[in-house]
Amino acid sequence: MINYLKSFFLYEIVRGMALTLKYFFKPKVTINYPYEKSPISPRFKGEHALRRYENGEERCIACKLCEAICPAQAIVIEADEREDGSRRTTRYDIDMTKCIYCGLCQEACPVDAIVEGPNFEFASLTHTALIYDKERLLQNGDRWEQALASKLHKDYEYR
């Protein structure tokens, strides 16, 4: 009987409208994206970058740990040995369409060569533009070196 009275007096509709009015006058939580941007966490995983040492030499020692640990198999590395016995990469490609941004490559790297930077706006109209070669990754690293170094410094105690 009580259910009949509730449905007769449209109790559920009034209750729903009250809830709507409650949230209607609260401040909005959305942002106008292209013009406003929300703050990014220091642990954000965005576009990849290869870092260099202060003297300009690339950090990557071609150990291929990032290639081995990548669950999406998005990283391809080819390396040559130099005269002094050390190895350096001749090819370092990341297919960003395969990448799942898990950060395992960054965690596996013993010299902090591959990192995920602060950029999340790198959409493209072609598939080939999302296959990053070594030069593009090094350019990303040069562009964001200050931000990457401070991010790694903040995160150091958790690694």
From Swiss-Prot:
GO BP terms in the entry: aerobic respiration
InterPro entries found in the cross-reference section: 4Fe4S_Fe-S-bd (IPR017896), 4Fe4S_Fe_S_CS (IPR017900), NADH_quinone_OxRdtase_chainI (IPR010226)
Main location: membrane
An example molecular function term from Gene Ontology annotations: iron ion binding
Membrane topology according to the record: Peripheral membrane protein
Keyword Zinc-finger among record annotations: no
Obligatory cofactor(s): [4Fe-4S] cluster
Residue sites binding [4Fe-4S] cluster 1 per the record: C60, C63, C66, C109
GO CC entries: plasma membrane
Protein name per UniProt: NADH-quinone oxidoreductase subunit I
Organism: Rickettsia peacockii (strain Rustic)
Gene that this polypeptide is encoded by: nuoI
